[in-house]
């Protein structure tokens, strides 16, 4: 900041060549005496050192020289008044910068210091520079701290000491040197000050670490100024950080902002809300000094499924983590298109009820695909596959007899896909809306894990499924106070295909939810189910329409508690 440039302030007083009537021999206030026609003052047009200058004989104690101009005093502005002086003859005086502090009512603020450090002239002909810094601030380096009462000043210098000496004074300068105080004024450091290039090619990780270390030790924050910063390793900020520039880093590396762990920070860091969400979610599975990724009520538009295991780089985690307080929207994109494969396979229940063998084209079958075909029950999914052995592992046994048949494997696409986790326990999703827009399904659970929890969430218009379990990741799952709103509300009951929830394992707690016009609310394959206080209605607009099951139990020994539910236009 330089007020002379940015605001056009005129700081430097007129040169002596403009006339000595512009210079006061008193305080510089209106009506005070000037140096015009004074016997002890003269303008010298061609001094060897100064060019034009003022020659002044000291006849008063002190001998004052002040500009009549009113230099503004502005909070946050630092002024340096300087003058070059040399003794010509006679006694050698001392020289100091001086001023007159003027209040808004044009009275002198006598309580503030109005003189700067004194410099003794010791040799005739030697050029000496005197200066002083004036500001409203009392920071170190300020010679005259004036506070907020003075609003202007008349500046110049004083000659002190014995009278009789003659000096020459170069034009007095007043300059804005606020920039010299910026580092003390600012509570941040720039990564470029520590060697970061921001060219998108050079690895700036070491500079980021150095800036963070300095910021932590000095209780300031870090600024990532404009540029593109390549980080080729993990980087952790233990200090607060603000991004004007962006970062790029390989997918396997993490940016951990432990004091600014929020979507706004990661969006700024990576240049888009979608990439910011993915990167913020990535570090949730590591140490960020947080257990919750709070989206702050933000909406994130996703152009494709988020493979959470691939994003995190992990396949197991048993520590509690929470994604909360936001909305995920499925953008219009071909990335949501279902994938499908058809293969001939053999089912031998006497050998393994969960396995298909001799599967043709097994490489084309995606883990998480729903299996359909003769002898296949409800909500049977591919849990894993072995390309070399030509086998597919199923989430549930088939009801059909042994034999070789053709099966279809359909892979739905989900906003959040946890199927890459071998085991994930105690993960929670709270206060989230999954706005599927008929483009995508909502959440696919991990292969195994205990205590996955949904609370106060809305599943809006899933294309195929709301919550899908392809294994035992639903063991002890909580679904509390959620809404499931179908994308098929206008269709006849018999034409609907979407399912809100399926569960394979035991002990889910499904409570106080509202479910609107799906083909089915829940397909439950385990036992120990607890369904309390849910309202699920699956009617249509037909006069005498077909009714289907709201809840389907696929095993005979269900050991289930169904209490206080509103079962509307459907059955169990």
List each model region and its residues.
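Extracellular beta-strand/beta-solenoid scaffold signature
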Residues: 256-284, 304-313, 339, 351-354, ...
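Extra-cytoplasmic beta-strand recognition segments
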Residues: 16, 60-97, 130-136, 171-172
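N-terminal extracellular ligand-recognition/capping segment immediately after the signal peptide
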Residues: 63-64, 205, 209, 216-291, ...
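Right-handed parallel beta-helix/beta-solenoid
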Residues: 175-207, 247-248
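Extracellular beta-strand ligand-recognition surfaces/modules
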Residues: 131-167, 172
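Right-handed parallel beta-helix
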Residues: 292-297, 319-330, 369, 425-436, ...
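Short carbohydrate-recognition loop motifs
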Residues: 34-64
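Small/polar beta-strand repeat architecture
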Residues: 177-184, 255-278, 337-351, 360-367, ...
């Amino acid at each position: 900041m330089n007020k002379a440039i940015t605001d056009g302030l005129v700081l430097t007083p007129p040169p002596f060549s403009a006339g000595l009537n512009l210079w006061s021999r008193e305080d510089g206030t209106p009506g005070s005496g000037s140096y015009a026609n004074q016997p002890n003052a003269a303008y010298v047009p061609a001094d060897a050192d100064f060019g034009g200058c003022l020659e002044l004989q000291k006849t008063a104690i002190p001998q004052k020289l002040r500009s009549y101009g009113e230099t503004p005093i502005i909070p946050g502005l630092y002024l340096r008044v300087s003058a070059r002086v040399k003794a010509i003859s006679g006694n050698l005086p001392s020289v100091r910068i001086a001023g007159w502090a003027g209040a808004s009512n044009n009275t002198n603020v006598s309580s503030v210091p109005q003189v700067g450090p004194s410099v003794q002239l010791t040799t005739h002909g030697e050029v000496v520079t005197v200066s002083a810094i004036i500001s409203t601030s009392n920071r170190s380096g300020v010679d005259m701290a004036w506070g907020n009462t003075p609003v202007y000043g008349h500046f110049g210098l004083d000659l002190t000491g014995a009278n009789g000496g003659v000096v020459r004074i170069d034009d007095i300068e007043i300059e804005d040197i606020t920039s010299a105080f910026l580092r003390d004024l600012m509570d941040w450091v720039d990564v470029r000050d520590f060697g970061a290039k921001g060219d998108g090619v050079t690895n700036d990780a070491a500079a980021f670490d150095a800036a963070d270390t300095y910021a932590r030790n000095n209780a300031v924050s870090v600024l990532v100024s404009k540029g593109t910063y390549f980080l080729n390793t993990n980087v952790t900020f233990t200090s607060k950080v603000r991004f004007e520039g962006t970062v790029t880093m390989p997918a396997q590396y993490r940016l951990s902002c432990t004091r600014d762990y929020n979507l706004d920070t990661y969006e700024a860091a990576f240049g888009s809300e979608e990439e910011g969400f993915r990167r913020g979610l990535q570090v949730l599975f590591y140490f960020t000094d947080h257990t919750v990724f709070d989206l702050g009520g933000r909406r994130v538009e996703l152009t494709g499924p988020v493979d959470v295991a691939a994003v995190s780089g992990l396949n197991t985690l048993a520590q509690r983590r929470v994604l909360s307080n936001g909305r995920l929207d499925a953008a219009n994109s071909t990335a949501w298109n279902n994938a499908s494969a058809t293969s001939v396979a053999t089912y031998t229940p006497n050998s393994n009820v969960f396995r298909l063998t001799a599967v043709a084209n097994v490489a084309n079958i995606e883990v998480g695909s729903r299996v359909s075909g003769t002898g296949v029950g409800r909500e049977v999914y591919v849990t894993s596959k072995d390309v070399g052995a030509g086998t597919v592992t199923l989430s549930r046994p088939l009801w059909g007899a042994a034999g070789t048949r053709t099966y279809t494997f359909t892979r739905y696409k989900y906003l959040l896909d946890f199927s890459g986790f071998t085991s994930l326990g105690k993960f929670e999703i709270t206060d989230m809306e999954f706005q599927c827009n008929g483009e995508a399904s909502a959440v696919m659970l991990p292969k195994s894990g205990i205590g996955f929890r949904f609370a106060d969430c809305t599943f809006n218009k899933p294309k195929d499924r709301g919550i899908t379990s392809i294994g035992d990741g639903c063991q002890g799952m909580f679904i509390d106070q959620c809404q499931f709103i179908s994308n098929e509300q206008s269709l006849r009951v018999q034409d609907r295909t979407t399912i809100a929830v399926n569960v394979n394992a035991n002990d889910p707690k499904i409570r106080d939810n509202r479910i609107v016009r799906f083909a089915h609310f829940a397909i439950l394959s385990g036992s120990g189910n607890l369904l309390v206080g849910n309202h699920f209605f699956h009617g249509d607009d037909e006069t005498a329409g077909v009714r289907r099951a709201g809840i389907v139990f696929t095993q005979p020994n269900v050991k289930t508690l169904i209490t206080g539910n509103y079962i509307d236009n459907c059955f169990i």
